[in-house]
Regions:
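Phosphate/dinucleotide-binding and metal-coordinating scaffold of catalytic cores
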Residues: 1-272, 276, 280-379
């Protein structure tokens, strides 16, 4: 295989990524400043060189469960190092940044109602066998990216379908209830569902516009210039600073308010996996950059009793209470005393409302202990 990929932005050739003498080299082939591949890699004559795969490209690589499945099936036939994986996945990578390919991937779409109401015990395994190679999404949780028909809208749209293993019981329900808290706190979230058998959490991609063109999306690993192995290295203060650096003036206040609420909820719900890859920015051009919707929120302490926050806050990885969280909002999110107090109260009310919603699941005797445990973790 040739060790290069032609990179496109909004379907136009932007540059070439190559791997030469153990170095990754990206060279722009355009002079149009709008065709930048990353907010941190503007168009320029000089190439962008790196010993590791550039974080923007690495963002497209699978991790954990998906990575193990792909390596198991394809390591006999092709290299499965970072560049080999990117080449393998590139035909299915759709977004503002994509790759020129001769091969066109066509897969029969699924129907949303069928996923939500299926009684097939092996459904997720079947989804993996069909969609694993077409799922350029990061994260260690078992998940695939699938095209699904929504009968309500009659549209074919991309959804992320997540499942869970025996070591993380009821993870789909956990994430669903946590995301309901986020939604109740008036934070922008993607469309999401829980299947009737609670085996699947299904979330719509949030970087696709109504006209089926794509928004740019970059997670904080990309914006920090870090590789995925460093996603637990950093602070929430640094994320706030990055928001202030990159977000457009007209969206800055709203983005900082939402980020503050995200942090409050992650602490209230004891989400120890709110790392750099679980926050990001979206944009359609350089003048319209804002905080991405919230995603991947779970109560990790249900499974890891003594889990701690993913990143440092106020110099420590501990579950700070109201006083310290309000201080964070004032000092680093540029909010007033009145604003942080009101936003914090909104998050607490959202959590309390969803606790009442969660209690409905206690009618199922198999869920009663799990729900009690989950609610007990929510401070």
């Amino acid at each position: 295989m040739n060790d290069f990929l032609t990179v496109k932005v909004d379907s136009k050739i932007s540059g070439v990524l190559s791997f030469e003498e153990n170095e990754y080299i990206f060279s722009y082939k355009t002079e149009d400043k709008k065709d930048f591949i990353s907010l941190t890699m503007p168009v320029r004559t000089k190439s962008w060189n790196s010993k590791n795969l550039h974080p923007l490209f690495e963002m497209h690589l699978p991790e954990g469960y998906l990575l193990s499945i792909i390596k198991k099936h394809f390591s006999k036939f092709t290299k499965t190092d970072d560049f080999g994986l990117l080449k393998l996945m590139s035909p299915s990578i759709k977004g503002r940044v994509s790759y020129e390919q001769d091969l066109k991937v066509e897969l029969k779409p699924l129907v949303l109602d069928d996923l939500l109401h299926s009684s097939n015990e092996k459904l997720f395994d079947e989804l993996v066998s069909r969609f694993a190679l077409n799922s350029p999404i990061s994260g260690v949780q078992p998940k695939v990216l699938a095209q699904i028909e929504n009968k309500a809208t009659l549209k074919l749209e991309d959804y992320i379908v997540k499942s869970w293993g025996e070591e993380y019981p009821e993870l789909a329900l956990n994430e669903y209830l946590c995301m309901r808290v986020v939604q109740k706190a008036n934070i922008c979230v993607p469309e999401f569902y829980l299947s009737q058998d609670r085996k699947l959490f299904i979330m719509k991609r949030f970087d696709i516009k109504e006209d089926n063109t794509y928004l740019g999306f970059e997670d904080m690993c990309v914006l920090f210039g870090k590789n995925r192995d460093d996603k637990y290295e950093g602070t929430y203060e640094q994320i706030a600073k990055t928001i202030k650096t990159f977000v457009s003036p007209k969206y800055k206040k709203e983005s900082l308010e939402n980020f503050f609420k995200m942090i409050v909820i992650n602490f209230l719900l004891k989400n120890g996996d709110a790392h750099l890859k679980n926050f990001g920015l979206i944009y359609d051009d350089i003048s319209n950059i804002k905080l991405a919707p919230a995603y991947d929120v779970v109560t990790t302490t249900v499974y890891i009793k003594n889990d701690i926050p993913a990143l440092h806050l106020l110099g420590s990885k501990k579950w700070w209470k109201e006083k310290q969280l309000l201080r964070f909002g004032i000092e680093f999110c540029d909010l007033t005393v009145k604003e942080v107090s009101e936003l914090y109260s909104l998050c607490v009310r959202a959590k309390d409302e969803i606790i009442e919603e969660a209690k409905i699941y206690k009618n199922d005797e198999h869920l009663s202990e799990f729900i009690d445990n989950l609610i007990g973790k929510w401070s």
